[in-house]
Amino acid sequence: MNKDAWYQYFTECEAVTDRNAELVEEKFKECEAYTEKALKKKYPECGVVFTRHAEAIKAGYFTIWIDTGSVTHKNIKLEDCGIKPVELYDYPIRPDYF
């Protein structure tokens, strides 16, 4: 096992993880902006759900809450809003893969 190769691998993994998290947060902000601009007209009392938002955005949707006396939730596809799906970076190949 090459110690330097593993160090480089884990450093690259950390960088990819951080960058992917930034991309998801940028996409989440787009979803919040779309909700404020378009969905508030149809659902005056609504907002974007933060819980598990990263998994949802990676899967191509986001969830809003709607309060009409009782709170309900609705999944909104990114493509239906004109928001491009998030394109995440691939992780590096493990040094012991070959």
What are these regions (language model features)?
Residues 1-9:
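Extreme N-terminal leader/activation tails
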Residues 11-18:
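N-terminal acidic leader/helix
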Residues 18-98:
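Acidic, low-complexity, intrinsically disordered interaction modules
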